[in-house]
Amino acid sequence: MVKWVYMNEILFAEIYYICVAIMLILGFKTYRSMMKNSQKASFLAVVFVHILYFQTDLVRMSNVQNLFLNEMSFLFFSLCTFSWFNYILTMLEIQYVKKTQTLIALIPLIVSVVLLLMNPLNGILFKIDQNANFQEGPFYLLYVFINDLYYLVGAYKAYVYSCRAKNYQQKKSYQILGIYMAVMMIVGTLQDIFRQVPIFCVGTSLSILIVYISLEEQMISIDPLTQLNNRNRMEQHLFECMRNADANMYLLVLDVNRFKKINDEHGHAQGDLALKA
């Protein structure tokens, strides 16, 4: 039994540190990227907070009876949800000018912190019994719900803005963000049910990686083989042309029949040369 517990701790540590490595790589790539400073700062904040959460939760899982570590794990989880909500607002270019708007956005985080401060006194969120078992308090579900609000509102805003998107590329980017927020809400709920399994750690790392790659692909406008404008660039150019209603626009489409036959008979190298020509 002792050996099994020891192996579990090693396995969990490996999972967490792999997720931390993924976050560090994404953070480094983002820091070196050409994205807007506001988007870069908000994404780096997401990466940093998640690394803190992963490290804290790993230590907590090996010291389940420690109330302070459990409190810190809950706190960083709340910061994770808020940091992603802030990133969604940044990507959607939503700016809160009034202080009241900022305060409203901070209410779920403030309530979470207040509940965590009160928890050691009366166990309203959770408590650890004598057998080191985690027991939910009367306000535990409230804590889960108010943190899920960031995911719900973020997904809703991404959906609304995708419907108002100016072009297909922007619409797709907003849809990716909205789907991610919905997935993260499901992953977070599963983590609340299975607290001793690193579901949130793995789920959020893979989701962030997929979102990062998907958004980077949306930014690529040059075909790597031909060095010509690709579909993304064509959509951007068509959108700019259609905005000018006074100008005439003509679209010439060239369809090459049996182009694949070149690859089949002469190989992919010759097919690439023909495509470039």
Residues of each region from the PLM?
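Alpha-helical transmembrane segments in multipass membrane proteins, preferentially the mid-helix core
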Residues: I25-G27, S83-Y87, N147-K166
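Conserved long alpha-helical elements within nucleotide-processing catalytic cores of c-di-GMP signaling
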Residues: R231-Y250, K260-A277
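Hydrophobic/aromatic micro-motifs used in signal-transmission helices and low-complexity FG repeats
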Residues: L225-T226, V256-R258, H266
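Extracellular-loop-to-transmembrane junctions of the mid-late helices
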Residues: V5-C19, M118-G154, Q191, V197
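Signal-transducing coiled-coil linker helices
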Residues: Y161-L225, N232-C241, N248
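Membrane-interface helix-boundary motifs at transmembrane edges
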Residues: T30-F43, L89-Q101, S162-S173
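Hydrophobic alpha-helical transmembrane segments of multi-pass membrane proteins
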Residues: A13-M34, S38-N63, L69-N86, A105-G123, ...
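Non-cytosolic membrane-interface motifs at loop->transmembrane helix junctions
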Residues: Q65-F74, N131-P138, I199-G203
